[in-house]
């Protein structure tokens, strides 16, 4: 017995109709029962309670996605950690009486020496684009202050690029450096806690910029390094060390930190009397 599905245009029900053809005279219509009203009510209420789909981000006529202005007003995650957790802990630990005494990260200076590529316009432009993608800010060219014959450098020649980060861009770069850049470094065991300069400033050297996800990996390509100098308002290295530790800087545990006390180098004019040489 063969069963065929037939759609009846005159049928008021929108449900499919099945007919069993036993003979040309006897035709029996088998109608599927409609779903109960309770199921329809539950489906309608679920659709009403579902959260609305987020609207697509606005785009300009050229196709560029426009960012909501309120996004720029939000506090960065690392900045919120500093305000809510770091400031109370350091204030209690060092006994500060004023909020302005609490050390903070003032700026970050990223420097990249180019060497022989500084004289190549394509290499210089490529290095500037890479550093701009990493830091989020376009760098400037650094030029030699004096001529050095052994390095074939003349005064005024471009020898590298540098960028100074402050504010939200600074916290964004520091967050990615701590959580993405340093952990992806090969054979990384932590940064040296003795890399302070005695005035609360910390310097990190990276041999490869490819540890940042913004730089694509190229087999056989030249690897450019970079120097990262974190400038803080701390008066001593212990305060700066504690500040960066609370921010998440992975210091090496097998290296003992020591307070660096550097004396000012006395030059020849320091030993000369003030009245000497005057007539």
From Swiss-Prot:
<feature type="compositionally biased region" description="Low complexity">
    <location>
        <begin position="41"/>
        <end position="50"/>
    </location>
</feature>
<dbReference type="GO" id="GO:0006412">
    <property type="term" value="P:translation"/>
</dbReference>
<feature type="region of interest" description="Disordered">
    <location>
        <begin position="40"/>
        <end position="63"/>
    </location>
</feature>
<keyword id="KW-0934">Plastid</keyword>
<feature type="transit peptide" description="Chloroplast">
    <location>
        <begin position="1"/>
        <end position="43"/>
    </location>
</feature>
<keyword id="KW-0694">RNA-binding</keyword>
<comment type="function">
    <text>Binds 5S rRNA, forms part of the central protuberance of the 50S subunit.</text>
</comment>
<dbReference type="GO" id="GO:0019843">
    <property type="term" value="F:rRNA binding"/>
</dbReference>
<keyword id="KW-0699">rRNA-binding</keyword>
<keyword id="KW-0689">Ribosomal protein</keyword>
<dbReference type="Pfam" id="PF00281">
    <property type="entry name" value="Ribosomal_L5"/>
</dbReference>
<dbReference type="GO" id="GO:0005840">
    <property type="term" value="C:ribosome"/>
</dbReference>
<dbReference type="GO" id="GO:0003735">
    <property type="term" value="F:structural constituent of ribosome"/>
</dbReference>
<keyword id="KW-0150">Chloroplast</keyword>
<dbReference type="GO" id="GO:0003723">
    <property type="term" value="F:RNA binding"/>
</dbReference>
<dbReference type="InterPro" id="IPR031309">
    <property type="entry name" value="Ribosomal_uL5_C"/>
</dbReference>
<dbReference type="InterPro" id="IPR002132">
    <property type="entry name" value="Ribosomal_uL5"/>
</dbReference>
<comment type="subunit">
    <text>Part of the 50S ribosomal subunit; contacts the 5S rRNA.</text>
</comment>
<dbReference type="InterPro" id="IPR022803">
    <property type="entry name" value="Ribosomal_uL5_dom_sf"/>
</dbReference>
<dbReference type="GO" id="GO:0009507">
    <property type="term" value="C:chloroplast"/>
</dbReference>
<keyword id="KW-0809">Transit peptide</keyword>
<dbReference type="InterPro" id="IPR031310">
    <property type="entry name" value="Ribosomal_uL5_N"/>
</dbReference>
<protein>
    <recommendedName>
        <fullName>Large ribosomal subunit protein uL5c</fullName>
    </recommendedName>
</protein>
<feature type="compositionally biased region" description="Pro residues">
    <location>
        <begin position="51"/>
        <end position="60"/>
    </location>
</feature>
<keyword id="KW-0687">Ribonucleoprotein</keyword>
<feature type="region of interest" description="Disordered">
    <location>
        <begin position="1"/>
        <end position="23"/>
    </location>
</feature>
<dbReference type="InterPro" id="IPR020929">
    <property type="entry name" value="Ribosomal_uL5_CS"/>
</dbReference>
<dbReference type="GO" id="GO:1990904">
    <property type="term" value="C:ribonucleoprotein complex"/>
</dbReference>
<dbReference type="Pfam" id="PF00673">
    <property type="entry name" value="Ribosomal_L5_C"/>
</dbReference>
<comment type="similarity">
    <text>Belongs to the universal ribosomal protein uL5 family.</text>
</comment>
<dbReference type="InterPro" id="IPR020930">
    <property type="entry name" value="Ribosomal_uL5_bac-type"/>
</dbReference>
């Amino acid at each position: 017995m063969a069963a065929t599905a037939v759609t009846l245009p005159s049928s008021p029900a929108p449900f499919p109709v099945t007919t069993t053809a036993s003979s040309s005279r006897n035709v029996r219509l088998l109608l599927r029962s409609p779903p109960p009203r309770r199921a329809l009510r539950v489906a309608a209420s679920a659709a009403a309670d579902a959260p609305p789909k987020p609207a697509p981000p606005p785009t300009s006529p050229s196709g560029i996605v426009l960012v909501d202005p309120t996004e720029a007003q939000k506090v960065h995650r690392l900045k919120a950690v500093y305000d809510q957790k770091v400031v109370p802990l350091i204030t209690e630990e060092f006994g500060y009486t004023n909020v302005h005494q609490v050390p903070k990260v003032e700026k970050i200076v990223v420097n990249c020496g180019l060497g022989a590529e500084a004289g190549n316009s394509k290499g210089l432009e490529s290095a500037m684009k890479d550093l701009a993608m990493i830091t989020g800010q376009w760098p400037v060219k650094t030029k030699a202050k004096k001529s050095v014959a052994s390095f074939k450098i003349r005064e005024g020649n471009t020898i590298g690029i540098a960028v100074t980060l402050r504010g939200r861009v600074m916290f964004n770069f520091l967050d990615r450096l701590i959580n993405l850049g340093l952990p992806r470094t090969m054979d990384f065991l932590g940064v040296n806690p003795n890399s302070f300069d005695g005035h609360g400033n910390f310097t990190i050297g990276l041999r490869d910029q490819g540890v940042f996800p913004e730089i694509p990996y190229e087999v056989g390509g030249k690897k450019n390094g970079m120097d990262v100098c974190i400038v803080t308002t701390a008066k001593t290295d212990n305060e700066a060390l504690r500040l960066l530790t609370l921010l998440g800087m992975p210091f090496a545990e097998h290296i003992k930190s020591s307070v660096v006390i550097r004396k000012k180098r006395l030059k020849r004019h320091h030993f000369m009397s003030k009245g000497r040489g005057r007539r």
